[in-house]
Amino acid sequence: MPNPVNRVSLLLIAINLLLAGNAHAARTSLDESVAAAMANFQVKIPAAPQLVEKAVGILVFPKVYKAGFVLGGGIGDGALQIRGETVQYYRTTSLSYGFQLGVQWRTEIVMFMSQEALDKFRSGNGWQAGIDGSIAVIAFGVGNSIDTDNIQEPIIGFIFDDKGLMFDLSLKGSKYWKVEEHPASN
């Protein structure tokens, strides 16, 4: 007669192995999405390569989903990269109110241009734009160019979708949370 404890143990081991495999696949998927978002950013924004070179850290959210009907919210998973390597996973959330209807997604990239700004961001458990620090959202200038030499802000942000850079948008009120495990493995 088979031992029920052995069956349960084997089942738990099998589930654990499946979940570990799925977590690895999910992490790989997010890492691939982050890499694709950075490549897309460097194609769509002419000054991106110079800004990437100057940044001490880059927070990349490949897809932030926004939905609303008067009251709205957004959520997305991403990664903090330093010198092109992922050092921590993050989640962003936001709430908004006003005229809004529907669901959309967008890519958000936040660049830390000073070590002090990056250290302050990383030191807390949560960080809110507009309260813990300001993010200067960059829009195209005259002739669709960005003057990288005159950017003095310690934290700059870009919001774009598959059509390109989005205008008149803000990251104010967005909250950023460290995710100890890979977001999809939770």
Model-derived features: where do they sit?
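Small-residue-enriched, tightly packed secondary-structure blocks
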Residues: A26-N186
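Signal peptide processing junction and immediate N-terminal pro/mature segment
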Residues: N22-H24
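Bacterial N-terminal signal peptides
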Residues: S9-A20
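Bacterial N-terminal signal peptides that target proteins for export
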Residues: M1-L11
